Design a protein with these regions (language model features):
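Catalytic beta/alpha-barrel core
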Residues: 74-78, 104-105, 125-127, 165-166, ...
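Active-site-adjacent beta->alpha loops and helix N-cap segments on the catalytic face
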Residues: 31, 80-89, 147-151, 195-215, ...
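Bateman/CBS regulatory modules and CBS-like beta-alpha motifs in cytosolic regions of diverse proteins
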Residues: 33-45, 52-54, 83-121, 128-130, ...
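Short beta-strand/loop segments at the ligand-binding rim of alpha/beta enzyme cores
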Residues: 44-51, 97-102, 217-227, 268-283, ...
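Glycine-rich phosphate-binding active-site loops on the catalytic face of alpha/beta enzymes
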Residues: 68-83, 246-258, 297-315, 345-379
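Catalytic cores of alpha/beta
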Residues: 61-64, 236-244, 277, 283-301, ...
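Alpha/beta catalytic cores of nucleotide-metabolism and tRNA/nucleoside-modifying enzymes
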Residues: 1-25, 105-106, 167, 227, ...
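Short beta->alpha transition motifs characteristic of CBS
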Residues: 75-80, 123, 127, 135-150, ...
Length: 493
């Protein structure tokens, strides 16, 4: 007689509340653990946090904030190619060792044009150049502050006499000394022929000192990734993102283990060979192996675990997240392809478990959707502050451009869409910096309990399977909470 269990059940499916990590002998203090890890084959993070490519989670403001904390943000694709590329460019210009392609204004431009540029790029000064890009002056907001004639040429009000400049070999310490000595905030960098080649600002030097753990490229710019779908304009979108300076591209679909995604991966590797390509989402080792064999520089693991995802109940498909992460980790163990554990995280302890199961980093959505930097709308409800948060499979998000993620790009009638997500609200949480601080603290504590000095060492940790009674015992019980902690709320609160 055939057995359903013997014939059809191929694995146990466990997730975060099914297990606990077993404490081990430790010589590791939480404050001494090393959190550096890899986001993709060639991109190193200083903390293992990636913000999700969701339209209520990551745009430039979030990407800047998470990169300054040591992680990386993935800018969502629910916008035009031009707007997504612009969001990437904003991140790349937010902080620099030296700005290699500074915004400039040509001779003859008006005060109105200078003010427009300053407002668009949120900058306080613009080098003025001639037709051959020779530096002829610099105009700052101080020059424009009381100027009433908007049609007046900037040539008449810019600083041009005794301009303080430096050369490309100047390091940031020497540049800081020059800025301090001359009491200026912007230092143009020129070549031997006085062509403008860069700009060093006091603000960037200060930021670098304030955030030494920031995730930066080799030019001192914040790192940023961006999501793309599997559509006819994917390669055009990728090229625009590369031109804007993107560090990695995420091919973001609901089912990464599919022919169209693998074909798009091959096209991407041929089209932009010097950019890391991350592919997701998947839930099995077989999927991971196929993507790695076809050139993926990282894989994203998670089908249906997210708080706003309904894939598992709508489609009946998915793998509980810890089992999925471990299956993928086992398949990729002998490769140099990292995995990103995406979804299902509610507490910092879940992050520790996801990394211990094999993740190199975790993707976070709901954990940061309530922060100041998220693009979601602010909502006041019953006197409390919330922010909107929706799945990319929700009807609202699909109407704005995420239909292709769920292979419904050709569906024109909104009534014919089959959503795999919901829209809702999450409590306001303050800034990303405050949230990441608590998550880093929980991760450090967990690694200390496990005796793991690095995330790679954390992969060796062991788990114990627990019952529902064990889950209840793990949470505060038999008490009324009178003082809330910044890193804990009761389930379903």
């Amino acid at each position: 007689m055939s057995s359903f269990i013997a014939d059809k059940i191929v694995m146990d499916g466990l997730t975060f509340d099914d297990v606990l990590l077993i404490p081990a002998y430790s010589e590791v203090l939480p404050k001494t653990v090393e959190l550096q890890t890899r986001f993709s084959r060639n991109i190193v993070l200083n903390v293992p946090f990636v913000t999700a490519a969701m339209d209520t989670v990551t745009e430039s403001q979030m990407a800047i904030a998470i990169a300054r904390e040591g992680g990386i943000g993935v800018i969502h694709k629910n916008m035009s190619i031009e707007n997504q590329a612009r969001e990437v460019a904003i991140v790349k210009r937010a902080e620099n060792g030296m700005i290699y392609d500074p915004i400039t204004i040509p001779l003859g431009s008006t005060v109105a044009q200078a003010l427009d540029i300053m407002a668009e790029y949120h900058i306080g000064g613009i080098p003025v150049v001639d037709d051959e890009r020779h530096l002829v002056g610099i105009v700052t907001n101080r020059d424009l502050r009381f100027e009433r004639r908007l049609d007046r040429p900037v040539d008449e009000i810019m600083s041009k006499d005794n301009l303080v400049t430096t050369h490309q070999q100047t390091d940031l310490t020497a540049a800081a000394d020059i800025l301090q000595k001359n009491k200026i905030e912007k230092l143009p960098v020129v070549d031997k022929d006085n062509h403008l080649v860069g700009l060093i600002t006091y603000k960037d030097i200060t930021k670098a000192k304030d955030k030494p753990m920031a995730c930066k490229d080799d030019k001192g710019r914040l790192r940023v990734a961006a999501g793309v779908g599997v559509t006819s304009d994917t390669l055009d979108r990728m090229q625009a993102l590369v031109n804007a300076g993107v560090d990695a591209i995420v091919i973001d679909t609901a089912h990464g283990h599919s022919k169209s995604v693998i074909e798009k991966l091959r096209e991407a590797k041929a089209s932009v060979p010097n950019i890391d390509i991350v592919v997701g989402n998947i839930a099995t080792g077989a999927a991971a192996k196929m993507l790695a064999d076809n050139g993926a520089d990282a894989v994203k693991v998670g089908i249906g675990p997210g708080s706003i995802c309904t894939t598992r109940v709508v489609a009946g498909v998915g793998v509980p997240q810890l089992s999925a992460v471990y299956d993928v980790y086992s398949a990729l163990k002998d490769t140099d392809v990292p995995l990103i554990a995406d979804g299902g995280l509610r507490y910092s302890g879940d992050i520790v478990k996801a990394l211990a199961a094999g993740g190199s980093s975790v993707m976070i959505g709901s954990l940061v959707a309530g922060t100041e930097e998220s693009p979601g709308d602010t909502i006041i409800y019953n006197g409390r502050k919330f922010k909107s948060y929706r799945g990319m499979g929700s009807l609202e998000a699909m109407e704005h451009g995420s239909k292709d993620r769920y292979f419904q790009a050709d569906t024109k009638d909104v009534k014919k869409l089959v959503p795999e997500g919901i829209a809702g609200r999450v409590p306001y949480k303050g800034t990303v910096q405050e949230v990441i601080y608590q998550m880093v603290g929980g991760l450090r504590s967990g690694m200390g309990y496990c005796g793991a000095a690095t995330i790679e060492k954390l992969h060796e940790a062991k788990f114990t399977r627990i019952t529902n009674a064990g889950v209840n015992e793990s949470h505060p019980h038999d008490i009324t909470i009178t003082s809330e902690a910044p890193n804990y709320s009761r389930p379903n609160d």
